[in-house]
Amino acid sequence: MLRGVVGAFLVSLTVAGSYAVASHKTVTLSVDGAPMTVTTMKSRVIDIVEENGFEVSDRDDLFPAATETVHQSDTIVLRRSRPLEVSLDGEGTKQVWTTASTVDEALAQLRMTDKAPAAASRGSRVPLAGMALPVVSPKTVQIDDGGKVSTVHLAAPNVAGLLEAAGVPLEQNDKVVPAASSPVVDGMQIQVTRMRIEKVTERVPLAPGNERIEDPTMNMSRQVVEDPGAPGLQDVTFAIAKVNGVETGRLPVANQVIEPARNGVLRVGAKPGTEVPPVSNGHTWDALAQCEAGGNWAINTGNGFYGGVQFDQNTWERNGGLRYAPRADLATREEQIAIATVTQSRQGWGAWPVCSGRIGAR
């Protein structure tokens, strides 16, 4: 008798254990797109969902259906509904319900994919408590993008959004009229000026420097290139400003020497007493030299007149020319102008009676 009771008890334990093992399962529960792994001994979809703390309303989407049986490794998907206060182009608001998690998904559910959110971005999450969703309808506008004109029919909350939707977003320092934040209206004309800074590297010559040697035997206004040196090569990076693709300026911002330049040698005059004052009214003296000597400051035809303004030897010497050169034709343009200025201050423009009149100097 006792042996029979014990046997029956063991059989019932075995059956109960087998049932528990068979009932225990691991499933995936996805709520509003967020999956989680749960273990359960429940069999119905609704029981597992509620067991994990989620309520299901008539507006929610639940798959499989609430009364369906769940098996090991199954997936349950719950998309909870949330209210939206939708208004179009700033007019009347109506409440709708959606199980979408993002604004973009909500517009798709509401069959409003041709509309655009006026405030939120398309990727914004829709909170479970709901949100206001003002949207705008498509508008027909003309875009002049740096001279390329096109007409588009798009929905966007403002000018910047419309340009982005059209595939030509504002970048860098681009300018747009009307302003980027302006609301889009039908028939609007948008003018875009593309302002770009581009970096370009070019290989260019590297100019040689000069070693200056002062020569006390040579007049101060003179210099002689003893050795011109040799240019090198460098890679220069320029920041190039462009307006609508047209270069408007460039500035070197970096360089790398590829081949160094060889410096030249410049011998400069340093002879005391040969200073030359700055040339004033140089265009007048050049015009006078053109009239007197065809513009040749070194002319000597043997007629007794020398240089660009045709000094005779007496005038050259009397007005201090010998400190520069024995004759005017052996002096530089600047040295001759210095002596001509002294001559003009003493004799007036009458020292050159014909040519001074022709050039309008008197």
Swiss-Prot record:
Residues 192-272 form the G5 domain. It is an enzyme of class 3 (hydrolase). Residues 1-22 form the signal peptide. Its EC number is 3.-.-.-. Keywords: Hydrolase, Signal. GO terms for molecular function: hydrolase activity. Belongs to the transglycosylase family. Rpf subfamily. This is Resuscitation-promoting factor RpfB. The lineage of its organism: Bacteria, Bacillati, Actinomycetota, Actinomycetes, Mycobacteriales.
